[in-house]
């Protein structure tokens, strides 16, 4: 029993020694790691000795000192500034339009700006040009003689010939009633005047025109128009319109007549033909045509009537009137 008590006492002492040793070791390690090192650092640099990265030129104090020195210099030398300004003004030269350099040099110099007297403003070249353009300009209209028509020219030639012959007859050089050459010359001049007078109406009526229009409030569908034209022998070609050739199916043969859209710009865009619609078509034939004009005109009239019947429209003449029998006879009379 005494041994057991002694053993417990020794074990307790051993445990107490181990705990004390561990606490002492931990305190020693902590003091070694977290030791106070502030005493070993050098003393801090005073604030007044801090080095600045700002250059001296940007220092407000130095700038104010520099400005003060410059102001003192400017105040101390007003006469020198006056002389420099006057010399700069003398070197300025402004040349106006219409003035040469010699005339400008002879002019007296302008009074300097700083002399205390008002100076007249100098008018530059652009100001002078703007003032000239702003003034109202009165332009007299130029009347040019209009070119005379062929009939008037032929009449004037005939009158001049008659006047010349009358003058010669008055002088006794020629007899205008008995001389055969004079009668031949007068006849030639008269024939020339008549031929020129007959050429003008022919030139004006060199094309026959017919219209196929839809009923009021309706329009022709684009795909149906193309289908009807191709069924009548038309071929899509030059100028984006349809043409009727002399030989059906042969686009290399001459064109007899053509058909275009009645609405501007008058073409058929096949890429958008599904969304295309128009109120009318115009058929036209140039005179003279390839082959017989009468035969071609009859073919044009027949084709126009068939197209109007296929589309459900009406045929109009060149005056936008209903095409009737009188219009047919008038068209045939123009080519007969």
Swiss-Prot record:
Keywords: Cell cycle, Cell division, Cell inner membrane, Cell membrane, Membrane, Transmembrane, Transmembrane helix. Residues 1-2 are periplasmic. InterPro entries: Cell_div_ZipA, ZipA_FtsZ-bd_C, ZipA_FtsZ-bd_C_sf. Residues 24-336 are cytoplasmic. It is found in: Cell inner membrane. It comes from the Bacteria. GO terms for biological process: division septum assembly; FtsZ-dependent cytokinesis. The chain crosses the membrane at residues 3-23. It is a single-pass type I membrane protein. The keyword Nucleus does not apply. One of its GO terms (cellular component) is cell division site. Interacts with FtsZ via their C-terminal domains. Belongs to the ZipA family. Essential cell division protein that stabilizes the FtsZ protofilaments by cross-linking them and that serves as a cytoplasmic membrane anchor for the Z ring. Also required for the recruitment to the septal ring of downstream cell division proteins. PANTHER family: CELL DIVISION PROTEIN ZIPA (PTHR38685:SF1). This is Cell division protein ZipA.
């Amino acid at each position: 029993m005494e041994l057991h008590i002694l053993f417990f006492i020794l074990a307790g002492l051993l445990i107490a020694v181990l705990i004390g040793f561990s606490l002492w070791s931990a305190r020693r390690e902590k003091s070694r790691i977290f030791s106070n090192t502030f005493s070993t650092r050098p003393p801090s640099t005073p604030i007044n000795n801090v080095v600045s990265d700002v250059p001296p030129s940007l220092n407000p104090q130095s700038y104010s000192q520099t400005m003060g020195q410059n102001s003192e210099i400017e105040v101390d030398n007003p006469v020198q500034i006056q002389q420099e300004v006057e010399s700069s003004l003398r070197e300025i030269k402004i040349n106006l339009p219409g003035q040469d350099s010699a005339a400008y040099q002879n002019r007296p110099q302008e009074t300097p700006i700083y002399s205390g007297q008002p100076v007249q403003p100098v008018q530059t070249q652009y100001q002078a040009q703007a003032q000239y353009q702003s003034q109202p300009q009165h332009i007299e209209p130029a009347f040019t003689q209009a070119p005379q028509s062929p009939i008037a020219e032929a009449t004037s030639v005939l009158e001049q010939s008659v006047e010349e012959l009358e003058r010669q007859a008055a002088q006794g050089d020629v007899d205008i009633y008995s001389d055969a050459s004079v009668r031949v010359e007068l006849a030639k001049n008269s024939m020339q005047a008549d031929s020129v007078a007959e050429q003008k109406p022919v030139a004006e009526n060199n094309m026959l025109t017919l219209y196929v229009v839809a009923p009021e409030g309706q329009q022709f569908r684009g795909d149906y128009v193309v289908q009807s034209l191709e069924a009548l022998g038309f071929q899509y070609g030059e100028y984006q319109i349809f043409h009727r050739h002399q030989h059906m199916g042969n686009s290399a043969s001459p064109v007899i007549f053509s058909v275009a859209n009645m609405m501007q710009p008058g073409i058929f865009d096949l890429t958008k033909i599904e969304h295309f619609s128009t109120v009318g078509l115009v058929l036209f034939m140039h005179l003279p045509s390839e082959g017989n004009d009468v035969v071609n005109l009859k073919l044009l009239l027949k084709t126009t009537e068939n197209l109007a019947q296929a589309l459900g429209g009406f045929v109009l003449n060149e005056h936008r009137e209903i095409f009737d029998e009188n219009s047919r006879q008038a068209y045939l009379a123009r080519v007969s």
